[in-house]
From Swiss-Prot:
InterPro entries: Silence_cplx_Nase-comp_TudorSN, SNase_OB-fold_sf, Staphylococal_nuclease_OB-fold, Tudor, Tudor_AtTudor1-like. Cytoprotective ribonuclease (RNase) required for resistance to abiotic stresses, acting as a positive regulator of mRNA decapping during stress. Essential for the integrity and function of cytoplasmic messenger ribonucleoprotein (mRNP) complexes called stress granules (SGs) and processing bodies (PBs), sites of post-transcriptional gene regulation during stress (e.g. salt and heat). Involved in gibberellic acid (GA) biosynthesis and seed germination. Essential for stress tolerance, probably by regulating mRNAs entering the secretory pathway. This is Ribonuclease TUDOR 2. The keyword Cytoplasm applies. The modification Phosphotyrosine is found at Y966. TNase-like domains are required for relocation to cytoplasmic foci upon abiotic stresses.
Length: 985
């Protein structure tokens, strides 16, 4: 559109943005090349004079409202062609012109329908006239004859056309009752016509049919500010001056403006000081959609300044649209919590989600938006099923993953419930008491979940620092994994497997609905529960019901005497009171070892250390000790049990028998049947309840040669698995060492294995192209890929050990990979990783983890650990020799291979083909290792091997070599009797 400098009589095209009276329009350009809203013109129809609407304190001229409504409904929002016929400089250069809607001349239509009269030019303004003046005069005469519009001949029609306006419509808003209007109309759609757009989110509107003139702020959002304004000394230009003078500067003086007209003219009576970016664009966006349009207003509330807050709906063809949502969706307004709280939850959620998407896409006002730093990252594709082993608190569980072998250190996974926070349990070691309702929240989950199969959907991880108030075991940051936990859905007709795969009740929602936790209010870009809205709804119900933490009641006081940290004398003093009770109900709080536990006795309000009478597991550090602990955690951890107390030992540990409450099973049989414990009846089996059941369980394990009985021979004295030096042929492998770790551990490949050659041939045949497109390949933890080794650029099979959470964003993102055929591990960029064909990835890794048998090698961080590592590296990896690896035992406690140092470990004697002594003996001789401590339960063949190795250690000790430089060294902690520590609560 041409600017104000355009010449007259030039036809232009535009769109009608506003109709201010029955003869005046605001027209905007259809296209423009500058930033911001398009230019616009105010055009008064030449030679016409429409009736005047009411001013401040006044009333309408007859038919004024109908005149404006005729023109408004005829052309608002439509494309028109127009030209300027003349200007009147005396009234600020106001432009008068001819406007065509399609083939229709708007001036002719207005006059023809009787909504304006034709103004004859004065003596001084003979040139200020419409080019269609003759036709207009003829049409006016016809309208008068027919009685159309203002020329109506119906008696009383003129008086009836005058609106009965309330004070707010004529400039007197002092007595306007906003609260009364809200009370009468809240939530009900009200018809209205928008008279002015103050800014993108504030409109002034006539509410029909009473014509209340009100200002409405769009609920839930705020558009950029139009800036502060300063009053000027210039006279206000009457926007409707043409309704009287139509170019005649000598016309009579007009009365005062109404509130609506005064506000419409405010742009001329003030000077813009400053405005926010996109303020003009937001205002124009709203003007283009609702200015002078029919809208529906739904009042939602009133603020402290008596301003009305509401939702604004307008029609776009056959569709009804929400102005607020449209503004936010187009990046022209921001979400505002305080007024959004007046909306219903669904509308509030939609508005918030729309803003978040705009921020992510950096639309308009969010173009330079930088999200705040977040310590949470999404977790993808890590759903699993498992059994709940432990309830740590009201918002944290330990779940045993069904897919990971029993006994593996990685089987138990700690899962924090997403987006909720329960009262903290405190820390007895720091003398921190549980918060109110913390015990109730934990107990609720314990009774609901312990031993139950659950479905876990991991959602995000969060880095927690000590300053965040979360108790951590170390001083550094800790990464916690959050997810949603569900009980399986009890669907009829489903198999157990199908039911287990269908999520049922959300545990977090159960906690929140009972008032035992609160929902975390996340920041915009923080990861959150996928069921966040359900959690908020549950919290609202709990607050309304004043449940637990939302009530005014204090939580029940509970004082527990912890005898596990008390003196042995106090425990002995307590013994008679426990012996008097036949069977004591208790809860297993913690598994201290395979046969020793911390129990809570509700009836006595005390915690005790408890051990089985006559049943003993391997000691700490001995074979199968960790497996025994893992078994008892799954079987009785946090379960309800019954105990009989027989005695107390010198450390204050109570001795007796225990039964799992539901099954009435003697808990000692779990260990004995699994071959993880043995009977000790030196003081008489007759004193042990159900001793015959325990003996049967032990006999069954012996017959099956389970665990500690694997080398048992009937009739011979057994010391943890063997009775004499075995004559069985031990497995011997011919190997080469491929990687050396610390502590006497290393990886080998079997020499002559056809799998090695097959894998190498398959890799050589691969054609590796360019790096995959970002986003098309997102390897996750545990996946097998091809990775390029940094030292020789060769491509090898590798397992992802660690990587970025979520989708890959850059080729430089780093992944930690474990080369499954060689045993080494390194960090490589995404560009050095390729997907691998299943035919190549399906074969097991060729690298086998081994450990030198019968000796203890210092770790890399210990004294002489570096020397030991370098020596082992020199005699194995650097020498390139082949070795015989005699397998003494297999350690399966490492579970599945998850990275370097995990998986099944072969405990071997390593002998070079051309050497006389083993590497094990050589390291003892060099003083960079020492022998394992002899234990009573060791097999006789192991004791014989230790006898043979002892001379090499004695030689190093006598010559003060290596670790023996300063004489005998103290045994490590494993060799000493462990000091009893306070049990964890």
């Amino acid at each position: 559109m041409a600017t104000g400098a355009a010449t007259e009589n030039q036809w232009l095209k535009g769109r009608v943005k506003a109709v201010t009276s029955g003869d005046c329009l605001v027209i905007t350009a259809l296209t423009h090349n500058r930033a911001g809203p398009p230019p616009e013109k105010t055009i008064t129809l030449s030679s016409l004079m429409a009736p005047k609407m009411a001013r401040r304190g006044g009333i309408d001229e007859p038919f004024a409202w109908e005149s404006r409504e005729f023109l408004r409904k005829l052309c608002i929002g439509k494309e028109v062609a127009f030209k300027v016929d003349y200007k009147v400089e005396a009234i600020a250069g106001r432009e008068f012109g001819s406007v065509y809607l399609g083939n229709e001349n708007l001036a002719k239509l207005v006059v023809q329908n009787g909504w304006a009269k034709v103004r004859r030019p004065g003596q001084q303004n003979q040139d200020k006239v419409s080019p269609y003046i003759a036709e207009l005069e003829q049409l006016e005469e016809q309208a008068q004859q027919e009685g159309f519009g203002r020329w109506s001949k119906v008696p009383g029609a003129a008086e009836a056309s005058i609106r009965n306006l309330p004070p707010s419509a004529v400039g007197d808003s002092g007595n306007f009752d906003a609260m009364g209007l809200l009370a009468a109309s809240k939530g009900k759609p009200m018809e209205g016509i928008v008279e002015q757009v103050r800014d993108g989110s504030t409109i002034r509107v006539y509410l029909l049919p009473e014509f209340q003139f009100v200002q409405v702020f769009v609920a839930g959002l705020q558009a950029p500010s139009m800036g502060r304004r300063q009053s000027t000394q210039e006279a206000v230009v009457d926007p409707d001056v043409t309704a009287t003078s139509n170019g005649d500067a000598s016309a009579e003086t007009r009365g005062p403006l109404t509130t609506a007209q005064r506000l419409a003219a405010s742009a001329a009576s003030s000077v813009e000081v400053s405005s926010d970016p996109f303020a003009m664009e937001a205002k124009y966006f709203t003007e283009l959609r609702v200015l002078n349009r029919d809208v529906r207003i739904v009042l939602e509330g009133v603020d402290k300044f008596n301003n009305l807050i509401g939702s604004v709906y307008y029609s776009d063809g056959d569709t009804v649209k929400d102005l607020g949502l449209e503004l936010v969706e187009n990046g022209l307004a921001k979400y505002v919590e305080w007024s959004a709280n007046m909306l219903d939850e669904e509308a509030k959620k939609k508005l918030k989600a729309t803003e978040l998407q705009c921020k992510k896409n950096r639309v308009k006002m969010w173009a330079n938006y930088v999200p705040p730093a977040s310590n949470s990252k999404a977790i993808h594709d890590q759903n699993f099923t498992g059994k709940v082993v432990e309830v740590v608190s009201g918002d944290c569980l330990v779940v045993a993953d069904d897919s990971i072998p029993f006994g593996s250190p990685m089987a138990e996974r700690r899962v924090c419930l997403s987006s909720i926070r329960s009262p903290k349990m405190g820390n007895p070691r720091r003398e921190e008491k549980p918060a109110p309702y913390a015990r109730e929240a934990k107990e609720f989950l314990r009774q609901k979940l312990i031993g139950m199969e659950v479905i876990v959907q991991m959602e995000y991880s969060r880095k927690i620092s000590p300053g965040d108030g979360v108790t951590t075991s170390g001083a550094g940051d800790r990464v916690m994994d959050f997810g949603s936990v569900f009980l399986p859905s009890p669907t009829k007709g489903d198999t157990a497997v199908a039911a287990a795969a269908t999520p049922g009740a959300n545990i977090a929602e159960l906690i929140i609905s009972r008032g035992l936790g609160t929902v975390v209010r996340h920041r915009d870009f923080e990861e959150r529960s996928n069921h966040y809205d359900a959690l908020l709804a549950a919290e609202a119900r709990a607050i309304a019901g004043k449940k637990n933490i939302h009530s005014a009641k204090d939580s029940p006081a509970l004082h527990i005497a912890d005898l596990t940290v008390a003196s042995a004398k106090k425990a002995k003093d307590f013994l008679p009171s426990l012996q008097r009770i036949n069977q004591i109900s208790a809860v297993v709080e913690y598994v201290l070892s395979g046969h020793r536990f911390k129990l809570y006795i509700p009836k006595e309000s005390c915690s005790i250390a408890f051990a089985f009478s006559g049943v003993r597991c391997p000691g700490r550090g001995e074979p199968y000790s960790e497996e025994a602990i893992a078994l008892m955690r799954r079987k009785i951890m946090q379960r309800d049990v019954e105990i009989v107390v027989e005695n107390v030992d010198r450390t204050g540990t109570f001795l007796g028998s225990m039964w799992e409450k539901n099954s009435k099973t003697n808990a000692g049989t779990y260990l004995l049947e699994a071959g993880l414990a043995k009977m000790q009846t030196g003081f008489g089996a007759d004193r042990i309840p159900e001793a015959h059941i325990l003996e049967m369980a032990e006999r069954s394990a012996k017959n099956q040669k389970l665990k500690i009985w694997e080398n048992y021979v009937e009739g011979e004295e057994v010391v943890n698995g063997s009775s004499k030096v075995e004559t069985r042929q031990k497995e011997t492998l011919k190997v080469v060492v491929t990687e050396v770790l610390g502590g006497g551990r290393f990886y080998v490949q079997t020499v002559g294995d056809q799998k090695v050659a097959s894998i190498q041939n398959q890799l050589a045949a691969l054609s590796l192209k360019d790096a995959p497109i970002i986003g098309s390949f997102n390897p996750k933890k545990g996946d097998i890929v091809l990775a390029q080794f940094s030292l020789d650029n060769s491509w090898n099979r590798a397992m992802i050990v660690n990587g970025p959470r979520g989708a890959v964003q850059s080729p430089e993102e780093e992944f930690e990979v474990f080369y499954i055929d060689y045993g080494n591990q390194e960090i490589v960029p995404y560009s050095a990783i390729r997907p691998v064909d299943p035919s190549v990835s399906s074969a097991p890794g060729l690298a086998q983890l081994c450990r030198l048998a019968y000796i203890k090698v210092p770790g890399k961080e210990e004294d002489f650990g570096r020397d030991a590592g370098e020596y082992l590296h020199t005699v194995t990896l650097e020498s390139g020799k082949e070795f015989r690896a005699v397998v003494e035992e297999r350690d399966t406690s490492g579970g599945k291979v998850k990275g370097q140092g995990t998986g099944t470990e072969l405990v071997v004697t390593l002998i070079a083909v051309d050497d006389e002594i083993s590497v094990n003996a050589a390291m003892l001789q060099e003083g960079i290792a020492r022998m394992e401590k002899r234990r009573r339960w060791e097999p006789k063949d192991k004791q014989a091997a230790l006898d043979a190795l002892e001379k090499f250690q004695d030689e190093a000790r006598k010559s003060r070599t290596g670790i023996w430089e300063y004489g005998d060294i103290q045994s490590d902690d494993e060799d000493n009797v462990p000091v009893r520590k306070p049990g964890r609560g």
